[in-house]
Amino acid sequence: MRVWDLHPGYLNRQSLLGEHQEIHALLTIVEEGRRGYAHHPETRRWREHLNALKMRHEMVVAEMRLRGYRHQSPVTVQGPVCWPEAFVDPPIRQFALLAERYRGKEPGRIPLPRSAQELWAQHKYSVLARDPERYRALGQRVAAAGSAPPPEDLVLELAMLLRQPPTPGGLRNALEHMWGYVHREGGLPPDGRAELRALLEAIQERAVRAGIRYLAESTALSDLAVWL
């Protein structure tokens, strides 16, 4: 049983659909008080954080929908979301586990990052949607790191940032930046949540169809859908 803390875009088909099933299993174990897996590390980790587990479910579902999988088992997030502080494995170790698991096999939508710059390029629009100041600071920090492997503290910081909701203005700002890579002609739709969802869907379709790697390998391509 495994609930990952990395963005679901790093998971291949088997891992993505497997995590979705295991989240539902965990919810059943905890909510119905079942004994099976009651002492599993993931059960202990999420027992007091069910709303956060349900938010992770929404993140997984957004990635599933981006890849064309149907979803017919919704859950409802009610009340505040408090994420567990503990990890079964820290995020940097989770990258290593995925690298071992995917050796010679189908990878995820987003390639496992070989450098801090690759990691940042994959996360930058998700960060921009949440905190422009952090976006600028992290961009400068990563530029100075060059092609060095992703440092543990950066991997952790990005994983934690993606748990936070974006701001309304940040969402639009990030989507407008992403739209700049795929627009052909015409303006942006007017402000409003429904219009922003339509804008993201247009970005998703064009990025995948045209093979624009910079966007197709971005966490934001599914991450932002959770909040629209």
Where are these regions (language model features)?
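Short, charge/polar-rich alpha-helical segments
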Residues: H7-L17
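Non-transmembrane amphipathic alpha-helical segments
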Residues: L16, I23-V30, V60
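N-terminal interaction modules that seed assembly of large macromolecular complexes
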Residues: L26-M55
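Short, charge-rich amphipathic alpha-helices with coiled-coil/heptad character
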Residues: M1-W4
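Sequence termini and other peripheral, non-core segments
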Residues: P8-G9, E22, R47-L228
